[in-house]
Design a protein with these regions (language model features):
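Short, Lys/Arg-enriched, disordered terminal segments
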Residues: 1-6, 385-389
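Conserved helicase motor core of SF1/SF2 NTP-dependent helicases
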Residues: 2-11, 17-21, 26-74, 79-104, ...
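Extended basic-aromatic, gly/pro-enriched interface segments that bind polyanionic ligands
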Residues: 107
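C-terminal structural cap/anchor segments
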Residues: 110-112
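Hydrophobic residues in beta-strands of the RecA-like P-loop NTPase core, especially within AAA+ ATPase
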Residues: 135-137
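Short amphipathic alpha-helical interaction segments
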Residues: 139-142, 348
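RNA-contacting regions in translation and RNA-metabolism proteins
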Residues: 200, 205-389
Length: 389
């Protein structure tokens, strides 16, 4: 089987996946870090690349290491705990990934020849991997020290791929290994980071699962007294509405001296399809809640698009029109903003973006980073005319 025929079977479906493929194909990067949510293609592309590398002879071995976690206790299980079952579990994971791309009998042949090797990170001392591709998957579930141990095992003509989820596969308030490894690799020579986001999740099932994870994070928030007050009023005036959470913004507005009338006192996050039931046919429900609580309320639906959240709470009412993209990049939400609106978006001394950062940390335990992007002159002029109207 040729390299081209195997790797061509998996086509990138998003700009992030296209960048991933380019980075994997560029041998100048000895260490490649792939960070993003479940379903974005990290493991699939990495495993196909590794298999392709040994089949074509570019590398002698493909080493796969992946922690196995007991979902009940949260404890990592080693090959000493599980014996032969440890290797069978990892092989099953590889089999599920490559189904439809390469015959499993071909992979088993590579395993029997020692060209595909499953390794336990706990038992790597004294080993050196020459002429090998090493995949360290699910890095968020490993101690950073274990991941660094893998890096020290890199020998001549070898590459390391580290894949992890720094957002959805960590507990609230924790500092996971994937985030720390990403920071460590950012400044390393011959290392390259590829951040994958929600737009890189192409399977409908995976997108649904990520949305449920987001919803679970929001629903598990501990509400303060103000948020409980709003929720109680919601249950009276909108009993048929499915509300995910309520976010108090009063204290944040005081902290960052936000005086804009556009920013509400509280944000209600409704499950997708239920925003209308919170607001009411003519807005009468949300108006009743505002009278009850003496607060300004705004409502958004929970989808995989965070732009409506920025539109709902940012102090500058029109700035959302200049938001080019909002998605996860590593452990943070990255907001790309047109250069002509970058100043108002950030605010004086960064007060607006610090307000947004605090808001998203409160609702999702995730920070915000903003990036200025240039836009075509024609598009910018068209935008300005539209705003004047």
């Amino acid at each position: 089987m040729s390299s081209e025929s195997l790797f061509s079977k998996i086509s990138p479906q998003s700009p992030g996946q296209e960048e991933l493929v380019k980075v994997l194909a560029d041998k100048k990067y000895e260490v490649v870090g792939l960070f993003g949510p479940t379903g974005s293609g990290k493991s699939l592309f990495s495993v196909i690349y590794g298999l392709d590398s040994v089949i074509t002879g570019r590398y002698r071995r493909f080493i796969v290491t992946r922690p196995i976690i007991d979902v009940v206790t949260g404890r990592e299980l080693t090959s000493a705990d599980l014996g032969e079952l440890y290797y069978k579990i990892v092989q099953s994971y590889i089999e599920d990934l490559v189904s439809g791309f390469v015959e499993w009998s071909r992979v088993q042949e590579l395993v029997s020849k020692g060209q595909v090797v499953i390794a336990d990170t706990h038992y790597l001392k004294g080993r050196t991997f020459d002429d090998s591709v090493i995949l360290l998957d699910d890095a968020q579930s490993l101690p950073v020290e274990s991941a660094i141990e893998v890096i020290t095992r890199l020998g001549k003509n070898s590459r390391l791929i580290i894949a992890g989820d720094p957002v959805f596969q960590r507990s609230i308030g924790s500092r996971d290994s994937a985030s720390m490894l990403r920071e460590l690799l950012l400044g390393e020579e011959n290392a390259r980071i590829v951040d994958l986001g929600l737009k890189d999740i192409v399977r409908p099932g995976a997108r649904r699962g990520i949305k449920l994870l987001l919803e679970s994070k929001m629903r598990s928030r501990q509400l303060d007294e103000t948020e409980k007050l709003v929720l109680s009023s919601l249950r009276v005036h909108a009993p048929d509405a499915d509300v995910v959470t309520v976010v108090n913004l009063v204290d944040l507005k005081k902290t960052y001296s936000i005086t804009s009338e556009h920013t509400p006192d509280a944000l209600v996050v409704a499950k997708e399809g239920y925003q209308g039931r919170v607001v009411g046919r003519g807005g009468e429900r949300v108006q009743s809640i505002e009278r009850d609580t003496e607060m300004k309320i705004r409502v958004v639906e929970l989808t995989l698009d965070f732009k409506p959240f920025i539109r709902a709470v940012h102090p500058v009412s029109w700035v959302y029109k200049h938001v080019v993209d909002v998605d996860f990049a590593g452990p943070n939400i990255a907001v790309k903003i047109e250069s002509n609106a970058y100043g108002p978006f950030v605010g004086q001394k960064g007060v607006h973006v610090r307000f947004l950062d605090h808001f998203f940390r409160r609702i999702l335990d995730t920070g915000v980073r903003c990036y200025e992007v240039e836009v075509e002159e024609g598009r910018s002029a068209k935008r300005s005319r539209a705003e004047r109207k």
